[in-house]
């Protein structure tokens, strides 16, 4: 029963634009000390998801989820006239969503999810541009517990959000494979990795990975820079690095990642996705650590 509940939560959160997450609960902290700059970014994140079974067999399950992120932006480099540093020093993302997962046939499940989130500096009362709406559909072929020598899982889906400048759904695909008793790999976006367990009981693991991270927030008091209006602040960063995981139980673990960016774009934009001012673009180190309960 517990495994079915965990699996249903997993598939509902697995297909978001932000992560291929299999988390049920997570608390983490991230820090970026920008290279060739005195600027830095820190982020706190907390996540919780709750299953609501609709039948005894657990073939139909509702899932409710909540996530909060706070991004602290410390800008010490010189900035152009009109750039109000205080307006972007603290950014918030508050997400709530609900989904429905049902079993189609053995080893196959389908799901839908809809949500709303606030992405804003929250300088005042909420405005229309602070709100973003999301929707996802997906199919899961899960063979992790099947009688196969190399367990695997496929996830296919489409994800749509009303993020400014993105008026089309994104296709999503994820493939997980256990190819040796102590080795697994995942292919997909935003994360591709190879994991090696350091001991037979799978208590400790190292992984090498490439991943994508980002954040976005509406600026309630738009800034005028060189005669152009900056309406939001965002960052997109592609990373490659190493991670360590310690499993307290099969599903509860501590993790720490040390990476370096391959591509980095931290900027102010308007709602047509035109760059107004680039804050940092040099490749840099990136650190993230936390505790999570996962499927």
Features from the language model and the residues they span:
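Transmembrane beta-barrel domains of bacterial outer-membrane proteins
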Residues: 20-126, 132-138, 178
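Membrane-embedded beta-strand positions of outer-membrane beta-barrel proteins
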Residues: 25-27, 62-66, 112-114, 154-158, ...
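Transmembrane beta-strands of outer-membrane beta-barrel pores
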Residues: 29-35, 66-74, 116-122, 141, ...
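Short sequence motifs at beta-strands and strand-loop junctions characteristic
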Residues: 38-42, 86-92, 127-131, 148, ...
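Outer-membrane beta-barrel strand-turn architecture
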Residues: 52-58, 102-106, 143-148, 179, ...
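Repeated loop/turn-to-beta-strand initiation elements of outer-membrane beta-barrel proteins
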Residues: 56-62, 107-110, 144-154, 182-185, ...
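Outer-membrane beta-barrel translocator/channel fold
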Residues: 66-94, 190-274, 280, 284-287
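Outer-membrane beta-barrel "beta-signal"
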Residues: 174-176, 281-295
């Amino acid at each position: 029963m517990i495994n079915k509940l965990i699996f249903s939560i997993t598939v509902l959160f697995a297909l978001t634009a932000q992560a291929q997450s299999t988390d049920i609960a997570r608390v983490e902290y991230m820090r970026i000390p920008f290279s060739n700059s005195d600027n830095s970014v820190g982020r706190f994140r907390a996540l919780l998801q709750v299953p609501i079974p609709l039948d005894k067999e657990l073939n139909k399950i509702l899932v409710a989820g909540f996530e909060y992120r706070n991004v602290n932006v410390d800008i010490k480099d010189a900035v152009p006239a009109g750039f109000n540093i205080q307006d972007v020093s603290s950014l918030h993302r508050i997400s709530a969503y609900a989904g429905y997962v049902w079993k189609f046939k053995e080893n196959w499940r389908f799901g839908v999810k809809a949500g709303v989130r606030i992405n804003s500096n929250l300088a005042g009362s909420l405005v229309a541009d602070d709100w973003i709406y999301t929707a996802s559909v997906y199919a899961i072929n899960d063979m992790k517990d099947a009688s196969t020598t190399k367990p695997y899982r496929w996830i296919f889906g489409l994800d749509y959000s009303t993020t400014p400048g993105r008026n089309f759904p994104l296709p999503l695909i994820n493939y997980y494979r256990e190819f040796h008793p102590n080795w697994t790999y995942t292919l997909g976006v935003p994360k591709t990795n190879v994991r090696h367990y350091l001991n037979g009981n799978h208590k400790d693991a190292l992984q090498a990975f490439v991943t994508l991270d980002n954040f976005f927030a509406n600026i309630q008091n738009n800034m005028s820079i060189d005669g152009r209006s900056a309406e939001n602040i965002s960052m997109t960063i592609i990373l490659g690095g190493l991670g360590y995981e310690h499993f307290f139980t099969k599903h509860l673990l501590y993790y720490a990642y040390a990476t370096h960016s391959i591509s980095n774009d931290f900027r102010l934009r308007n709602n047509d996705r035109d760059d107004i001012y680039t804050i940092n673009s040099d490749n840099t180190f990136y650190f993230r650590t936390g505790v999570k309960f996962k499927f």
